Amino acid sequence: MIDKLMSRRRLFEAAAGALLLSGCSSQDESSTKKVKKQGKIKKAESSDGDKHLRDKDELYEVYDDSGIVTMYLTVSRGNSSENTDHSWAEINAYSVYDYADMGVTRYQVMGLLQPGDVDGPVAGEVGYGEEAPNATVQVRGQTSSMNSQKNYKVELKKGKGTWRQQRAIALNKHMGEGMRFRNKMAYDLIRGIPQMMGLRTQFVHLWVCDQTEKSNDTFEDYGLFTQVEQLNKTALKAHGLDKNGHLYKVNSFDFHRYEDTIKLADDPDYNQTNFEGMLEIKGDSDHTKLIEMLDALNDESQKIDDVLDTYFDTENLVYWMAFQILTGNCDTQNRNCYLYSPLNSKTWYILDWDNDGMLRKLELSLKGFSDYASWERGVSNYWGNVLFNRALRSKAFRSELDRAVKDLRSYLTEARLSKMIKHYREVTESLVFAAPDIDNLPVTKDQYEQIAAAIPSEIEENYKSYCESFKKPMPFFIGVPQIDNGKLRINWDASYDFEARDIRYTVELARDYAIKDVLFKAEDVLLPEVTCDAPDAGQYFVRVRATNSDGYTQDAFDYYVTDDGKHYGMKCFYVQDGGKVVEDTYEEG
């Protein structure tokens, strides 16, 4: 029995050995076959040093934004907790300044938003088939809130759906702009500029049914609006940016340190209202990084090129600036843009916002209104901003700016702009020249035709202004005159010349802003101060101009405002009984 077991064991071992040898033989044979050598894996280089922002082109291809979308908005009263227990008449009656005077937040109403076509709401769109409100509605904007035709913000409530992945729907009337298509035109142009970040836009025909006062099922025509994507966390994410980053809407900020206002949120003296008067918080509320950047920027001992390398992307700055200069969008010295920085980055970027003031040179001229002239053309427009004042003193920055300006000049051709204007007119004119918009249009039909024909050539005019601005001295501020021992002392900041040319000043004191009734005049003044006999009590104007050795003249930053616009280069002041001098001030609207 033992012999049989041993015999079976030997047989099993022999079989196992044979299988093992067979396996080894097979492995040896396969290992001798030639295997094609694989090439080295190609890996992308680290992007840590690449600070440039790039928009998502495919984002603009999802929807056709070339025509007009019809929107139906039914407004109704809500509740006091949400501040929606108001009438539609109240919503349209008050401006942001009225709310400030009343000490209350902007009134809202409930709304049912239903996008559709000329026949009504369309299936598949937000709000279709619904009867209960899905949104809140309020007037938006600052100075525009004083207009008879308002801009609206329609905020879709959470869980009520979105329109094109957006909950905040901003509808802009652009009442003061005669063409009514400039803002969309700007963003359509930005789509073709890789170095700039844009936003999605759409022409909208709005109809409103007011149910806040009584039962009603009739929609009233509110005319043409331009919907512009709201720059918020949702938009940051959609455009491939950091939704957790820092985002500020620049309301009135020229990059001075402003230590009394720009503080950390946990500072005992922090006042958010004052802070947001300068920079409206739209993202992360930790201002540490902002303050670090401002400290460095306002530290004259730090080289500006080093500051720019550390805290900014020069490409972003020069292309944003070049676009504003060439399009003549002058009201961007210290507002009408956003400041953005990814959460874990030191780099800050300027993002474009509000372009309805662009390409308006002829339109303003036809209205007989003086604005966006003198130093507001070319690089001098940004000289009062600490960031650009310091940056423009750098030859390297000026060289990059010049390359960007020339690049965009070759893109913003008359042919391109003419083609775009032709399309916008075909899409919008039927609404622009019909009620209710025709009743508030600031230009006549003939003027509209003149402006449309002239817009494409304004790019070249603005380019010439840009080139000439480097030849002139830079603008400067006039101080408040002082009276001492019967003498009036007038001083001002020194002007600056990019080529260090000799600068002399002309000073005039007059009783009128036309500077015809002149009391005192000094020419070829070398130092930024003069004295003259103190005038009697009354209103006076002092005008100071700087002229360099090449004969180019620049006005002071100061200006006097009348119904006809700005009168550049002068400061208005009053001498009261007893010799006290009171400065005339003007708040930008």
Q: Whereabouts are the PLM-identified features?
A:
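N-terminal secretory signal peptides
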Residues: 1-6, 14-21, 31-33
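Beta-strand-rich modules
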Residues: 535-553
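Extracellular fibronectin type III
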Residues: 550-582
